[in-house]
């Protein structure tokens, strides 16, 4: 009987961890992203029904990130203290309930006497609070399993759920709106919110039975596998620092990371919340066709993001790959506006812009985890994600205001 070389044994263990965690976490993130951005499809008819302006929609789409910003760090610290399994489950169930309640925006407006736009703002704000901590919580959870040099591939696979949420969700959203409108007295966009909220609640309950809080609790790992994983994390921990929150917030690197992430997010969410409308304005009228074109764009983005991220990891060079991806993405986003009369040229440039954003984002998240540990990485990841995600407020809001102005 031959014995595998240590590096081969190590690769097998990490492959086992990846196959156990990433498909499930990716599915959770896919649903999170779908519930966050399905408002882009609902917008196609919701604005007329609720008599809302483009600017009001842009503000409401973005105000999600204000709630997200305010509660992100407390949520991630709670996850670090309470445990990933329970806290991720809590996040998913509560955001599913709030997302489903978006269907009753008009009803709440009639009951409270508030304007529909005001109710829309509050529900989006509450959705941000409910979802706060999920993505950095999952990043923190990956830090419990992978040393930093292995994280970029795991994060790239996780982030592939972003475009895949559109690949899967866009045709489904189009089909729901085209097939369910008027059923049971609900409009097409109301059915969209109701049906797409249910998976978050189901998966949230599933988290309690599927995930463990860490390596030691994982019955699916042999004792030797657990020792190997813990040894690799302990070896890397010697080069990291567990900062107090006060020291962390005064660390220059934290705010550089945050500024970079904010700019990436502005472009990514500018695309995500407006792509169905961008496609519609090039002359496409069928909701199902808009869904399929959106799906095609994000499928190509997902493939490019994974391929380029793996190339960066193989070459052990992430900074220039991330910088080049962000620069190319920004350039293509600008070019998409110059060819807005052509559906396929617009989609081609937006696809490259989306891929650039995803690549830079995937590679970016391996940087903070390489210098922080413990509560420091929990607070640091949450701080970067929460402040950086304010770009998700500014991007959609500015696009909405510009659309009304133009």
Can you annotate each of these PLM segments?
Residues 123-160:
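Cytoplasmic helix-loop-helix junction between adjacent transmembrane helices
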Residues 39-40, 246-305, 361, 365, ...:
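Extracytoplasmic gate region of multi-pass secondary transporters
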Residues 93-114, 327-341:
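C-terminal ends and interior cores of transmembrane alpha-helices
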Residues 153-181, 199-200, 385-395:
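Glycine-rich segments within core transmembrane alpha-helices of 12-TM secondary carriers
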Residues 71-84, 303-317, 403-404:
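Helix-to-loop junctions at the C-terminal end of transmembrane segments
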Residues 316-367:
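C-terminal transmembrane helical hairpin of 12-TM major facilitator-type secondary transporters
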Residues 88, 120, 321-322:
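Primarily marks hydrophobic transmembrane alpha-helices of the MFS/SLC 12-helix fold
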Residues 46-47, 78-79, 172-184, 279-280, ...:
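Interfacial helix-cap and linker-helix signal at transmembrane-aqueous boundaries
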């Amino acid at each position: 009987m031959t014995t595998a070389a240590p590096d081969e044994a190590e690769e097998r263990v990490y492959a086992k961890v990846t196959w156990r965690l990433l498909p499930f976490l990716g599915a959770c993130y896919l649903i999170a992203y779908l519930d966050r951005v399905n408002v882009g499809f609902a917008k196609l008819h919701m604005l007329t029904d609720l008599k809302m302006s483009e600017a009001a929609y842009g503000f409401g789409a973005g105000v999600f990130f204000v709630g997200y910003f305010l509660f992100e760090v407390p949520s991630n610290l709670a996850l670090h203290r309470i445990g990933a399994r329970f806290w991720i489950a809590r996040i998913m169930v509560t955001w599913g309930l709030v997302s489903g309640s978006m269907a009753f925006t008009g009803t709440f407006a009639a009951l409270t006497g508030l304007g529909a736009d005001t109710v829309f703002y509050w529900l989006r704000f509450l959705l941000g609070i409910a979802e706060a901590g999920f993505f950095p919580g999952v990043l923190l959870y990956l830090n419990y399993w992978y040393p930093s040099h292995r994280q970029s591939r795991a994060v790239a696979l996780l982030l592939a759920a972003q475009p895949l949420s559109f690949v899967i969700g866009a045709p489904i959203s189009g089909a729901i709106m085209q097939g369910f409108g008027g059923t049971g007295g609900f409009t097409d966009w109301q059915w969209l919110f109701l049906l797409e909220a249910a998976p978050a609640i189901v998966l949230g309950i599933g988290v309690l039975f599927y995930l463990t809080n860490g390596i030691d609790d994982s019955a699916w790992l042999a004792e030797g596998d657990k020792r190997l994983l813990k040894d690799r994390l302990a070896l890397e921990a010697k080069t990291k620092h567990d900062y107090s929150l006060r020291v962390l917030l005064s660390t220059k690197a934290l705010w550089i990371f945050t500024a970079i992430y904010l700019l990436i997010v502005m472009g990514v969410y500018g695309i995500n919340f407006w792509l169905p409308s961008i496609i519609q304005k090039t002359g496409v009228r069928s909701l199902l066709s808009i869904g399929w074109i959106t799906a095609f764009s994000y499928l190509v983005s997902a493939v490019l993001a994974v391929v380029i991220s793996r190339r960066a990891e193989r070459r052990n060079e992430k900074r220039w790959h991330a910088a080049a991806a962000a620069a190319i993405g920004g350039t293509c986003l600008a070019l998409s506006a110059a060819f807005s009369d052509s559906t396929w040229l617009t989609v081609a440039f937006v696809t490259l812009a989306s891929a650039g954003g995803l690549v830079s984002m995937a590679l970016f998240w391996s940087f903070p985890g390489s210098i922080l540990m413990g509560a420091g990485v929990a607070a640091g990841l949450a701080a970067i994600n929460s402040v950086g995600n304010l770009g998700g407020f500014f991007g959609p809001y500015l696009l909405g205001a510009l659309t009304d102005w133009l």
